[in-house]
């Protein structure tokens, strides 16, 4: 089984982007907003700060108290919208429980041309048409891997498992536009992925995906994330696939989607900076 290194792909993307930014003389600025947050949230923000620096850009972190109100948060977003030194704005999710139901409304306050995460309803809506906008970094990360093995999706059979607004829905929209034979499932069942060239599993449970029902040579993208006794794991039982000698290509958890997602965020950030010129 071929294990795909998300870290290696991300490094390639960052290096190319750094060189392009240097040639064009741009140093994009990413403003990140974190409301409250746990240790893991600070870790993810730190990874994005490092990626911005590694690609020739810079970042700001606005760390607000856990009890920040919706009005206070949206006022901070309005300030960043007007700040011409800021090219992209990222709201670290999830928000605290008191703000969680207002997530879409708060995301909508970010100017679409600075919404480098592609999370706002405006950018999500543009996906269904041909208007330019920012695509979710999770969907772009998946597409980056898929295109390395399938430059053309026409006639390929793909199965996506999940219903998320940041991965499954935008990725499905892109794949349909490229004439892919697509099935989107709410949950994973081995028989329903039979014959798939591409399998993306976001929704499920730890280790649910094994060789049963899968075609040899399938590209599997694990987009699950669970904490277990042995650390972080995903939907794919990698050990079982390796024991069985199953022929597949796997983007695993950990070390798969995460690094690529952040690298694609940096590409969106650079695009936002270019559009201001």
Swiss-Prot record:
Keywords: Amino-acid biosynthesis, Histidine biosynthesis, Hydrolase, Methionine biosynthesis, Multifunctional enzyme, NADP, One-carbon metabolism, Oxidoreductase, Purine biosynthesis. Pfam families: THF_DHG_CYH (PF00763), THF_DHG_CYH_C (PF02882). The gene is folD1. Signal peptide: none annotated. PROSITE patterns: THF_DHG_CYH_1. GO terms for biological process: L-histidine biosynthetic process; methionine biosynthetic process; purine nucleotide biosynthetic process; tetrahydrofolate interconversion. InterPro entries: Aminoacid_DH-like_N_sf, NAD(P)-bd_dom_sf, THF_DH/CycHdrlase, THF_DH/CycHdrlase_cat_dom, THF_DH/CycHdrlase_CS, THF_DH/CycHdrlase_NAD-bd_dom. PANTHER family: C-1-TETRAHYDROFOLATE SYNTHASE, CYTOPLASMIC (PTHR48099:SF5), C-1-TETRAHYDROFOLATE SYNTHASE, CYTOPLASMIC-RELATED (PTHR48099). GO terms for cellular component: cytosol. It catalyses: (6R)-5,10-methylene-5,6,7,8-tetrahydrofolate + NADP(+) = (6R)-5,10-methenyltetrahydrofolate + NADPH; (6R)-5,10-methenyltetrahydrofolate + H2O = (6R)-10-formyltetrahydrofolate + H(+). Gene3D superfamilies: Leucine Dehydrogenase, chain A, domain 1 (3.40.50.10860), NAD(P)-binding Rossmann-like Domain (3.40.50.720). NADP(+) binds at residues 162-164, 187. This is Bifunctional protein FolD 1. Belongs to the tetrahydrofolate dehydrogenase/cyclohydrolase family.
């Amino acid at each position: 089984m071929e294990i795909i290194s998300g870290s290696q792909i991300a490094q390639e993307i960052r290096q190319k982007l750094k060189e392009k930014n240097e040639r064009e003389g741009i140093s994009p600025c990413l403003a990140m907003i974190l409301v409250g947050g746990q240790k893991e949230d600070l870790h993810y923000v730190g990874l994005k700060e490092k990626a911005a620096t590694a690609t020739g850009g810079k970042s700001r972190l606005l760390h607000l108290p856990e009890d920040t109100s919706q009005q206070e948060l949206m006022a901070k977003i309005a300030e960043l919208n007007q700040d011409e030194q800021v090219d992209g704005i990222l709201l670290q999710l999830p928000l605290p429980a008191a703000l969680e139901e207002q997530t879409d409304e708060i995301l909508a306050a970010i100017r679409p041309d600075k919404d480098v995460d592609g999370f706002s309803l405006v950018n999500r809506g543009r996906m269904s048409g041909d208007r330019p906008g920012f695509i979710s970094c999770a969907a772009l990360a998946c597409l980056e891997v898929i295109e390395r093995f399938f430059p053309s999706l026409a006639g390929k059979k793909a199965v996506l498992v999940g219903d998320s607004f940041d991965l499954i829905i935008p990725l499905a929209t892109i794949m349909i536009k490229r004439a892919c034979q697509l099935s989107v499932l709410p949950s994973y069942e081995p028989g329903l992925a039979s014959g798939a060239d591409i399998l993306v599993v976001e929704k499920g449970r730890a280790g649910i995906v094994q060789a049963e029902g899968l075609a040899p040579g399938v590209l599997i993208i694990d987009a699950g994330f669970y904490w277990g006794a042995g650390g972080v794991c995903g939907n794919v039982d990698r050990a079982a696939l390796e024991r069985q000698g199953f022929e597949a290509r796997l983007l695993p958890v950990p070390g798969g989607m995460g690094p690529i997602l952040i690298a694609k965020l940096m590409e969106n950030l650079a695009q936002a900076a270019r559009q201001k010129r």
